[in-house]
Structure formats: structure tokens, C-alpha cells
Amino acid sequence: MIDYINVIGAGLAGCEAAWQIAKRGIKVKLFEMKPKKFSPAHHMETFAELVCSNSLRSNQLENAVGLLKEEMRLLNSIIMKCADAAQVPAGGALAVDRTKFSQMVTELIKQNENIEVINEEVRELPKEGITIVATGPLTSGDLSKHLADFVGEGYLHFFDAAAPIVTFESIDMNKAFKAARYGRGTDDYINCPMNKEEYEIFWNELVNAELAEVKDFDREVVFEGCMPVETMAKRGKDTLRFGPLKPVGLVDPNTGKEPYAVVQLRQDNSEGTMYNMVGFQTRLKWPEQKRVFRLIPGLENAEFVRYGVMHRNTFINSPVLLDATYCLKKSPNIYFAGQITGVEGYVESASSGMVAGINAAMDFLGKDRVVFPKSTAIGALSHYVSDSSIKNFQPMNVNFGIMESFPLKIRDKRKRNYETAMRALKILKEYVSKYS
């Protein structure tokens, strides 16, 4: 009998899965192809690399992803432990210093005596034992082909985009200003205001800018949560002003008025030396990014630490293939976790790794699997990806809409969400005593 569990991929989901298995006293072989081989979007040698934004989104219980974070904390998540420790200012959101975060996860994984890290590319599934596939949206070519043949349902393809990062010292703070919307919270964001003329010049250059060639990009299939800014701009001249460039609740101290549009920059590291352009995921050519984004007031001399990039995202038809424990229905010794399952977002990916890891451990120990209830965020997400009634499966962030509803006579949405969250945490605490 194999005395360990295989986990393929040391991203957010894979690290969380390995951690959950190891803390239950079971040996893990964690396979990671870095640093021998990198995907088009990965650059760091460390685990759990954040390739898009450095924000894990809201930390508030009134928001579903805030609830999901708290549920994961209850279940002793390594990802939440490291994210909380590597936090940088971001208002009500949980943003992290991506380098410190990745280093912390890597150190904890490597220090765990139950986890053996193997730096090799896996080209096909192991023939024996329990395996968790957490290879992410950029699964390597050979393994992608093997998995496509193995699951028999084929793959769905789309593309994600990452936003540029600029240095703080290159931002003209005589034009830009720090402020929170409506004066709420701390002034964590840098705001670059635009008048109507500046915005229209910027918009025109953006929609006509030259795009980078993307291999196999033969049709525009994008996920709303990570849509390229130029794609959004092409939907209409005012789309950006009602999206990531909305000016509401902000007053330009130089004019005393609300700007026509505002580009926001969010702190990207602990030192505050780097800021990412919020909502500016892009597939423009790099020289075009420099030219067009320097039209933004305050960024005329911006130094780009990282340009935006476009990369492939691959995921399986989970409702057909998986059950609510992320186990492959036709092969109960195989689990999937992370974005390859169609969950969307850093926290969601890690949560799927948590569920897969817990259940792989239960299988290994000969115990019943854990199906988390739809009344919890972590359970609602696992039920969504395994809902066989879904005919046109698309990636999904966690939200209160997929959770089991209760008859709450509360009209205020935030209060209703908060009560839903409190009920979810109460229910989950009953599971913690059993399965943590």
C-alpha cells in the first residue's frame, strides 16, 4: 500500500491541500516543476505565487469572500495564516506583500516533516495511490493532454490578464492624491484624477493601442473579474468611468471637485515602494502600455516594475466530472483543486485545496468524506462546481447567491449578509471539532 498522498502543483490550492493532509499526520509528496520550468505567467521560484493582483479582496463578513476567509481561518488554513502575516494597507481588503507571502508559505511547507517537495514536472497521473491535481490555470502541455484524455470531457480555455506595477517614487503626487471613497477608512489608495478631455484622449488611445500576440487566442473569452482594461473600454466610452475608473466619493484636492474619472493605484508591497494599477489587467504590447498609461495624470513619468501580461486559463468541466468533495467521480482516488476546477480567485482556489486535502486525508484514513453544507461559503463553492444541473459551466467567485438561503426578514443587504455569515460560521464550528 502507498503510504503517502500525491499533490501535483505548489500553488495556493496545492499548498493548502498538502498542509491539510500533513497536519493530519499523513505523508505528502508535493510535486512542483519550478524552478526547473516556469509557466508564461510565473516568475518566482517560491510557492503560492500571486500572478494577478496582490489583493485577496474583502476582509469584511458582509462580503462572501470575507466570510470564506474566516471559515478557512477556523479550519487552520496555511494560506490565510501567511496572508494575514504578510498584509499591507488596503482599506477593508486583505492585500499582501506578494514576495513575503510566497516566501512564508514556502518556508512552512518545506519545514513540515510530513511534506516531501519534489521539483519535477509531472507529465501524467501516478498510477497508484491518492492524487490531488492542483496544477492551476497554466497546466503544462504534456499534463494537459494527459488529463484531457483521462477525464474524457475535454477542456475549456480562456485567458486571464495581470495588471502593471509602478514605483511610488515615479508617481507625481502633485497631481495624484491619497484618499478613500467618501472619506471612509484610511487613505490607502493613490488616486490619479482625470478631467473630461484627459479621459477622452486616454480612452481613444487605449482602444486603438496595439495588442500583444497571444498564442492560440482565437476568440475573445474573458472572465469578468479579470477582464483586460482595453476589452472593457471597447464596450463603450463610459464603461471604464462606471467600472474601475469610477470617480464617485472622491474629491480632487487641487480642484475641490469630483473628477471626471479616476485611476486608482493600490500598494503592492510592505515598504510602499510599488503600486499596482487597479483594474488594469491588459494584453497591450509593453511599449504601448508605457505610452498609453503615461497619459494618465500623475503617471507621465511612471517607472513600470512589471508590465501587464496575458496568460491562458484552463479548467475542466467540473459539474460533469467532480463531486462536492472535488473528487473525480469515475476515479475516486483522484481529486482536483484550484482554478483548474473552475473556482475563480485566490481565496476560492485555496479553499478548494482545503476541501480536497481534508477529503483525500479522510479517504487515506478510511473515514467518511466531508461534504460541507451549502449554508457555508466553502460548502456553497464546492456544491457549485459539482452541480450537474449547470449546462454552461463558467468560472465563479464565491458569493452569497450560491449559498443556501434562509428566511431572514432583514431589508438592509449588508445586515442580511452579516447574519448569513454569522450563521455560516456557527454551522462550520460544528464541523471544525470533527474534521480539523
Swiss-Prot record:
Its cofactor is FAD. It comes from the Bacteria. It comes from Acetivibrio thermocellus (strain ATCC 27405 / DSM 1237 / JCM 9322 / NBRC 103400 / NCIMB 10682 / NRRL B-4536 / VPI 7372). This is Methylenetetrahydrofolate--tRNA-(uracil-5-)-methyltransferase TrmFO. It is an enzyme of class 2 (transferase). GO terms for molecular function: flavin adenine dinucleotide binding; tRNA (uracil(54)-C5)-methyltransferase activity, 5,10-methylenetetrahydrofolate-dependent. The keyword Thylakoid does not apply. Disulfide bonds: none annotated. The gene is trmFO. Keywords: Cytoplasm, FAD, Flavoprotein, Methyltransferase, NAD, NADP, Transferase, tRNA processing. Its EC number is 2.1.1.74.
